[in-house]
Regions:
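The conserved acidic donor/metal-binding loop of glycosyltransferases
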Residues: 100-104
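Glycine-rich, basic loop-to-helix element that forms the pyrophosphate-binding segment
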Residues: 74-91
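Short aromatic/hydrophobic "clamp" motif used to bind/position activated sugar donors
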Residues: 96
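N-proximal low-complexity "stem/linker" segments adjacent to membrane-targeting elements
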Residues: 1-30
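Conserved nucleotide-sugar donor-binding catalytic segment
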Residues: 153-237
Length: 341
């Protein structure tokens, strides 16, 4: 096992999205404090040559700022979970900052993070608020946060395990303590698209998940998911959309992970996580399914019922809204988001 050096690795699981990939590199270059290295694992997309060329163009620019850019071409399509695991493994520095290849860093993102990790050097993971944007980060759609103050979520702090999903469901800007994560590496949950939730469940039961007060990244909305090309994903997931079966598979995996890790540490993290998925997170899923056909909507309902996540009044109400109002239901979701801001 390669020993971790003190410092930061920015880790990018790259797949297609050439334009967004270069925008991400620009955002890293423009930060007030740069990482020690940028590690990119390209997972066999059709745009590999273009992505590699952009990486080569930026390598010398980052070297001038003492930041090493490493572009790795995976021999086979590993899929999301295995690619994240590989990024953690091949990184050289203690703090591995994951970011999707269509998200962006904010100017002081890494400075804010460094100040926190300097004070919490044994923390297992770090999460963050983030700005939601579509095409232009200077025209944000909103601000996503789960806490008004800096915090550490853990079983020892008597936090609710619902904070595991709230803090780590979105991968952009999540920080992994590489020394802590390497011994936990497993292929068991490949295809779940939630390797970070596996790590977060472990973090919650051990040294905790830190949460920053200020945002460090921008999370892009609107791009379709590209999961489904790897062998571990192709049976369920379809590139370009979250199908009902795909979403149910993801949430079923979260429940299985929480049961496994809860048993490992003798901590009940399953109950609150299940309620979190059934109530708060169902809002996001039904919002994403505004305007879909009745058949797709009924399939979503059926899949949620199979994993017992349709028993609460909230998913039933949201299903009804989508069923009767179709695309006009978007007005309801926008109103709720505006009130919640």
């Amino acid at each position: 096992m390669k020993v971790s050096l003190e410092g930061f690795s920015v880790a990018i699981p790259a797949y297609s999205r050439v334009k967004e990939f270069e925008e991400l590199l620009v955002s890293i270059y423009d930060m007030s404090f740069l990482p020690n290295e940028i590690v990119i694992c390209e997972d066999g997309s059709k745009e590999r040559k273009e992505l590699s060329a952009i990486g080569s163009q930026w390598k010398s620019k980052f070297q001038e700022k003492n930041c090493n850019l490493i572009f790795i071409e995976n021999e086979i399509n590993l899929g999301y979970d295995a690619n994240v695991r590989k990024l953690i493994e091949v990184s050289s520095f203690k703090w591995v900052v994951l970011i999707g290849n269509d998200d962006l860093f904010l100017k002081d993102g890494l400075s804010i993070l460094k100040e926190f990790t300097d004070r919490n050097e044994n923390i297992s993971m770090v999460s963050r608020p983030f700005i939601r944007f579509s095409d232009d980060i200077n025209k944000p759609l909103g601000f996503s946060t789960i806490d008004s103050k800096e915090n550490i979520y853990s079983n020892s702090n008597k936090s609710s395990s619902k904070m595991i999903f709230r803090s780590c469901g979105f991968v952009g800007g999540l920080v992994i303590n590489r020394n802590w994560a390497l011994p936990l590496a497993t292929k068991k949950y490949d295809g779940s698209l939630y390797y970070q939730i596996y790590l977060a469940c472990n973090a919650f039961c051990t040294n905790g998940i830190g949460y920053l007060k200020s945002p460090t990244v921008g999370g892009r909305t609107g791009n379709p998911p590209l999961f489904g090309s790897a062998e571990s994903e192709s049976e369920i997931h379809i590139p370009g959309a979250y199908s009902a079966k795909g979403r149910a598979k993801m949430w079923k995996s979260v429940l299985e992970i929480s049961q496994d890790i809860g048993t490992k540490y003798k901590v009940d993290i399953y109950k609150d996580l299940k309620k979190e998925l059934m109530v708060k997170q169902s809002f996001h899923v039904f919002e994403m399914n505004v305007g879909v056909g009745v058949r797709e909507l009924k399939e979503l309902k059926s899949e949620l019922k199979k994993i017992e996540l349709f028993n609460h009044i909230v998913p039933k109400f949201l299903f009804t809204i989508n069923y009767f109002f179709g695309r006009n239901a978007l007005i309801f979701y926008r109103l709720i988001r505006k009130i919640a801001q």
